[in-house]
Amino acid sequence: PSAYSQIFSVLLQYLYDRFYPQVFDISRFATDALDFASAIHAKGQLIENCIGFIDGTFRHCCRPEDDQKVIYSGYYKGHGFKFQSVVCPNGLLCDFGGPHCGRRADSHMFRASGLEERMRQLSQKVGKILCVYGDPAYCRGEFVSKGYIGACTAAQARWTELMNALRETVEWGFMLV
């Protein structure tokens, strides 16, 4: 069985290395980016430059014989790998990253994925700073927006509620993967 696993792993790595740039490249959506931002703005109001929704997911796996600590997640209480994706308003996964060690936080996946640099390049192509909307696990930054937490006004709470409802589409995308 381990020979099959190794062959499968090598094949997956080859496919990932060979086709990732063509399949999951957010810059392919440069022509649609402003349309995406307009569609999200029409639904969520306050934000005019959001082109998609980002989230991470955890997929359980069998406990490995070696290096168990690397993929163990205390939060999920099990071993597994994490993946990150960005879903655009048209329902397509426009960026996908992983696998990452199960113990890593979503904000680490964002930094490790190189998505920030791709967002910077896309923003330069479009001529406007664009962002993705994420859950509270992501750090707010130039290219990541997230909802208000803690004490906030009624308008801010309503906006967060609207955007979180829209953000559910990224979780539906994980069901396809």
Predicted regions mapped to residue ranges:
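Short, well-ordered secondary-structure "scaffold" segments embedded in the functional core
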Residues: 1-177
